[in-house]
Regions:
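Ligand-binding pockets and gating/stacking loops
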Residues: 1-486
Length: 486
């Protein structure tokens, strides 16, 4: 196989650098940045790698609604009517086939099948089966592609989340947003190309930790890592000028600092110095762009109502979905939401009902809002967690409650928007929802398909690192799932 390698070499001159640079703040302190001023010419960071996109894209940007903790497919998008008659019977060994279990259930003496407590109904022209827990998402079914045959090798949360976010279970690889920002560049000179928001669910108090490396850039230049938007009066740290410092003075100090950094760059040829220069300049421009982003007074009441009652509370999933739409309007390339709290090992009916209420209306509103603004056609949306849940009960099964363990062999997600066929389902599992029987889609197949929607050949977006040609879709043979493409 021939790969189209693009080295991480420093641009040969200042003009090239300024037209190709992007930015991420990461953990760099920026307490001394200056205010916006007419003196500051905003350098363009719009250009990505030469030759990208490889072909005409269907999508310009991605919104990834990651449901951290792994929502159960049996209570969301995987309708298995036979589970009603199989309820409380033992999961046959012929179905499990000795497959690996977690330490939480491997010692159980019994593996009773647990039916879903919630009803399913068909929706839209495609007759998509969706749980009663998600009535608002169901209204968007004609725009959804529900994938019921996702699978992964990872059985524990952190490696499984890392796998979805970076294409590898090993920590330290570039995240999906970093790869896309690196390859395609930014569409907005005044905001980072990759922004991250985190919300906590109401269904479970404790959630899996989310480490900053999940939106990191790995061996790519640090300008491509994600920037976290916080739910506070200071959404991005260290953008404001120190109290009592006139903007003109801060601008002059920034110019002087740029000159010193430029001298160091010319002497040392360290790409991270170039990144630092652009970090300061973008942060300078963000002093105006971020307050404008966070100003919701221009949102009509009927739009706020679409997202539900939590939309006015900073840090909620609803608020973050509205922010995602505002970022899409501003052409941010990759918008990552994490919603924590889906790890329902016990008391699943109660916990999952609360989690679903957190995300159902805002997720549906985001899709509908993008569509009414003409943005859905070129915005790719992904909704799902890191693996699925077992058909058998973890712990004691009763008529009122049950829990489900981790299940990497098969689970469901949905996609919508740019490049994706709506109103369809893809893949199928057996009667127990345990093994895939049709259309398997690996995590790295998802990555290959996402890149394809953005006009990128996943086999050609690579970097050489420690003897490997790293790519988001991994080093094994993977495929674009053309069956779900519009």
């Amino acid at each position: 196989m021939t790969h189209d390698h693009t080295p991480l070499a420093l641009p040969s001159n200042r003009r090239t650098f300024l037209t190709r640079s992007g930015l991420s703040l990461g953990t760099v302190a920026m307490a001394s940045l200056a205010a916006r001023s007419a003196r500051a010419a905003a350098p363009s960071n719009s250009s990505g790698l030469v030759g990208l996109p490889h072909f005409a894209p269907k999508a310009k940007r991605v919104i990834y609604l990651f449901q951290s903790g792994a929502p159960s497919q049996f209570e969301s998008f995987e309708y298995k009517p036979r589970l009603n008659e199989l309820h409380a019977t033992e999961l046959p060994d012929s179905v499990r086939m000795g497959q690996r279990l977690t330490g939480m259930t491997s010692g159980q003496a019994s593996f009773p099948v647990a039916r879903s407590k919630f009803a399913f109904h068909q929706h839209g022209g495609g007759g998509t089966w969706i749980s009663e827990l998600f009535p608002h998402i169901a209204t968007q079914s004609d725009d959804l592609c529900v994938i019921r045959s996702m699978h992964t090798e990872a059985i524990n949360h952190d490696p499984a989340i890392t796998f979805f976010q970076t294409g590898s279970q090993l920590a330290g690889r570039p995240s999906m947003g970093a790869w896309i920002a690196y390859g395609l560049g930014s569409l907005n000179d005044n905001l980072p190309s990759f922004l991250v928001m985190i919300s906590r669910g109401t269904g479970r108090a404790a959630g899996q930790p989310l480490y900053d490396r999940l939106w990191g850039s790995g061996p790519l230049p640090s300008q491509y890592q994600g920037v976290k938007l916080r739910a506070s009066s200071e959404p991005i740290l260290y953008l404001a000028n120190p109290a009592g410092c006139p903007p003109q003075i801060r601008r002059q100090m920034l110019d002087d600092l740029r000159g010193l950094n430029q001298q160091s760059l010319e002497r040392l040829h360290d790409p991270e110095i170039a990144t630092r220069i652009e970090q300061y300049e973008l942060a300078f421009r963000m002093q105006t762009a971020v307050p404008d982003l966070m100003e919701f007074s221009d949102e009509p009441e009927h739009v706020l109502a679409m997202y539900g009652p939590e939309v006015n509370k900073p840090g909620t999933y609803a608020r973050n979905c509205l922010l995602a739409r505002r970022l899409a309007e501003r052409d941010v390339r990759f918008i990552q939401l994490y919603h924590m709290g889906w790890d329902q090992h016990d008391n699943l009916p109660d916990h999952m009902s609360k989690q679903a209420k957190d995300v159902d209306q805002p997720s549906a509103a985001l899709i509908a809002d993008l569509k009414q603004r003409g943005l859905l056609d070129d915005t790719l949306i992904i909704w799902g967690g890191e693996f699925g849940r077992t058909v058998y009960c973890q712990g004691t099964l009763t008529n009122e409650t049950y829990g489900r363990d981790h299940h990497p062999r098969s689970f469901s997600i949905f996609m919508a928007g740019g490049g994706i066929k709506g109103g369809m389902t893809y893949g199928a599992t057996d009667d127990y929802g345990y093994n895939i029987v049709e259309g398997p889609m690996h995590v790295n197949d998802l990555h290959a398909t996402v890149l394809h929607c953005l006009g990128i050949d996943h086999e050609r977006l690579t970097i050489p690192f420690q003897g490997l040609d790293l790519r988001l879709s991994g080093v094994e043979q993977r495929r674009v799932v053309s069956e779900i493409l519009s």
